[in-house]
Amino acid sequence: RNASSCSCTRVKSLVSKLAITQRRAKLADNVRALIAVDWCQPAIKEAGQEWLDNMDDGKKSKEAGQKLLAACKDGIDLTGTEYEAKWIENGKVCDCEACTLARKVIEDADLLTKKSFWIFGGDGWAYDIGYGGVDHVLAQNQDVNILVLDTEVYSNTGGQSSKSTPTGSIAKFAAAGKRTKKKDLGMMAMSYGYVYVACVAMSANPAQLLKAMTEAEAYHGPSLIIAYAPCINHGINMGLAQAEIKKAVDCGYWTLYRFNPELAEQGKNPLTLDSKEPKIEGYQDFLKGEVRYASLAKMFPDVAEGLFEKNEADALAKYAKYKSLAE
């Protein structure tokens, strides 16, 4: 699939999210109207209010929704009541306001549980050719999550350089090493102030990854998680990908952090730096351990030295900036 069709798919995901949001808003209106009916059964009133109070919480909305659905189904069944004969005569359908609204709730039962929306993509899409779409989705301030698998290169189309490609890395269209630094997508997203942002790396800190995913899912707004993802184009043994991820974080090549706007609302610093002080003595060894960098040193040793130094300086400057903002 080409990048333009991928961007179109992600825009459709947002449209789907907006459609679900509108349908759930209509469902909430029906529930409010239902529990406002004087003769509505107490069980439905109680379950309906519980669902309204928790409709934006994934787990709680599911539990409350099941109670409300059961109460509505029981409420429209008039077996054993004084209205049973007329109810049966009418095809087991009561046309009163309460029963009519209860049936509408039952018809929309698939909307009772809050839906989780995740958009997945690579760095070529998120940083580069589809960035306009990513930015548009984040700017809408909708409850949608984006997970970017950052390989720092266009992996699916043959290894072309992207705006995520760091200084000195060899890729198609950058055969002599990329001369500009990596785009800081996370910082750009944070500038909105209302976007949850996290930079993660699975094997380097699994707990931080899970915490970021959990916080992003719980946050009632847009979320962006950027995950370091080793790729065959890096020129490494992919069986050792998890070890390579840890090396990247340990030496400071990849910085772990979480930016949670909810903390700012509590008067706290929204940025949490999860990376430890980088072991910079291992930085150049990390670069030279990957073919995407090592091949540049073989072909253009003089150029490579300067670009590798700039790569390290860029990474350490980024860490220092995030450390300062987190203090």
Give names to the regions the model predicted:
Residues 19, 126, 174-181, 200-208, ...:
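Catalytic cores of large soluble enzymes that bind and process phosphate-bearing ligands
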Residues 77-105:
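Amphipathic alpha-helical binding modules
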Residues 93-98, 124-136:
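Conserved phosphate/anionic-ligand binding catalytic regions in large, soluble enzymes, centered on
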Residues 106-115, 242-327:
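Conserved acidic/glycine
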Residues 113-118, 128-143, 149-277:
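Glycine-rich ThDP/TPP pyrophosphate-binding loop and its adjacent helix/strand module
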